[in-house]
Regions:
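Primary mode marks residue(s) on the alpha4-beta5-alpha5 output face of response regulator receiver
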Residues: 1-192
């Protein structure tokens, strides 16, 4: 697995991507082209911190970058074009209008949300992104790949603890490959 920073045309950070080699047995065909996109023999999943429409056109000025920092929003690319992105609510109160399913609150991380998880779902449909809210505010997101990736960047939560951050836990998770997770915090002070 590779983690890749994405920069706009002005050279300011604009997002982050994870890439899985095509030789891996992951992702499922259901996840190819949304949210994973094939490029250079890797399946990429990308998240943007600014409106994807400006990344390759105008980017952000030095003044905007100084004022806004790393970004203003969180967009999950969900198709072959960055414009096919889902904007994530800043406030947890905006989540009920979406398909994100409330998981559990994990100490020092926050409340986990998983996309459209169901107890009886197929793991081929398991969307590999989760959101974290702390104090009602989006404070992190992460990737959860159903593949035992070997990287110092990822964690491998034992199946015995998955119910501590996911609710419901899809039955298929217990039969699927181990999860490889990576958390990306959007705050200067994650409570770790």
């Amino acid at each position: 697995m590779a983690v890749i920073l994405i920069y706009d045309v002005q050279g300011h950070i604009a997002g982050i991507s994870a890439a899985v080699p095509t030789t891996a047995a992951y992702p499922s065909s259901f996840l190819k082209n949304h949210p994973f996109v094939m490029y250079n023999n890797m399946h990429h999943i990308s998240v943007f911190f600014v409106d994807p429409a400006i990344i390759c056109s105008t980017g952000r000025s030095n003044g905007q970058y100084t004022q806004q920092g790393v970004g203003t929003d969180l967009y999950l690319q969900n198709g072959t074009n960055p414009s096919d992105s889902i904007k994530i609510p800043h406030k947890e109160s905006g989540i009920p209008a979406t398909h994100w399913t409330r998981g559990r609150c994990f100490p020092s991380m926050g409340v986990h949300y998983w996309f459209n998880t169901r107890k009886d779902m197929s793991c081929d449909e398991f969307y590999p992104v989760f959101l974290l809210y702390n104090g009602g505010q989006l404070n992190a997101f992460g990737w959860a790949f159903q593949s035992p990736m070997t990287s110092t960047r990822v964690e491998h939560p034992p199946k015995s603890v998955i119910s501590a951050f996911m609710n419901p836990v899809p039955d298929c998770i217990y039969q699927a490959a181990d999860l490889s997770t990576l958390h990306i915090y959007l705050t200067n002070n994650p409570a770790l």
